[in-house]
Every structure is written in C-alpha cells, then in structure tokens.
Amino acid sequence: MQREEVTELIVLQKIRKQLSWAQLAEVIGQSKEWSTAAMLGQMTLTRAQAEAVGTALELPQEAIALLQVPPYKGSLPTAVPTDPLIYRFYELVSVYGTTFKALIHEEFGDGIMSAIDFNMDLTREPDPKGDRVRIVMSGKFLPYKTY
C-alpha cells in the first residue's frame, strides 16, 4: 500500500461513514486544519492518533502504520493546479506573493515565514452578499543568518 492509497481510503471511508473533517479532528485531538492536512498525506500522526483515526475509519493496520511515517510534504503536482479552488490559492500567491514578501521583509527583515512552526484557522464569515471564507495563517518568522 502506498501513502496516496491511504489518502484515497481515508476519503472513501469518511464519505461512507458520513463524517466531517472536524469530527475526525476531534478523534485525533488536533485542529481540523492540521488533522485534515495529516489525513490528506501532508503531516505525520503519532501512534495514538493513527490508531484512533484508524479505528474511527476502520483502516487496515498497514494504513495505520503509513500514517506514522513522515510524508513527502508539498507533494502536489508542480504544474499549475487545475482544481478551481486550489488554483485560486495559486492565483493569490501569483498576484500577492511579491506584496507578502515586501511587507514581511519591511516588518521583520530578510527571512521567511515558517510553514513548520505554523498555525491556520479556517472559518465561515457571514456576509449579506454571500458568506466569506476566512483563513488566518500564523507562521514563525525565521531570519536568514549570516556566516
């Protein structure tokens, strides 16, 4: 079994059991954002977390074991994404990436925002013109060092 197959199985079982990502996050004991990333193959679960979600989704032992192996992170295809929702994030970075970079450098200096020491919160924001998606990302600033 490959890690991609585990992800497919998780999605299938989630649908079959009519569970939400938030419900599965409760089983794992982490945020819905981190837990969803983990179940979609981008994070490593502890043994207890993998066994808990494995029980909830009736996953085979091989899948539970693979959930505990550090994944190849950022493993989406390198071509421009075709999924409309994912493409909007690509577009967002294409349009605002240089702005993010300029403002972060002006505020913090030369460095990067960590995606390792990182938090994200996704919520629905009611709006009379149509509900909005609110995503708050918080990453530790890591300055480049001189040597």
UniProtKB/Swiss-Prot annotation:
Xref: Pfam families: Cyanate_lyase, CYNS_N
Keyword check for Lyase: yes
Active-site feature positions: 88, 91, 114
Record keyword Lyase present: yes
Reactions accelerated catalytically: cyanate + hydrogencarbonate + 3 H(+) = NH4(+) + 2 CO2
Gene Ontology process terms (BP): cyanate metabolic process
Superkingdom assignment: Bacteria
InterPro entries from the UniProt entry: Cyanase, Cyanate_lyase_C, Cyanate_lyase_C_sf, CYNS_N, Lambda_DNA-bd_dom_sf
Gene3D superfamilies per record: Cyanate lyase, C-terminal domain, lambda repressor-like DNA-binding domains
Entry-linked CDD domains: Cyanase_C
Molecular functions per Gene Ontology: cyanate hydratase activity; DNA binding
EC number(s) recorded for this UniProt protein: 4.2.1.104
Keyword entries, A-Z: Lyase
Function in brief: Catalyzes the reaction of cyanate with bicarbonate to produce ammonia and carbon dioxide.
Family matches, as HAMAP family: Cyanate_hydrat
PANTHER family xrefs: CYANATE HYDRATASE
Record family assignment: Belongs to the cyanase family.
Name assigned to this protein: Cyanate hydratase
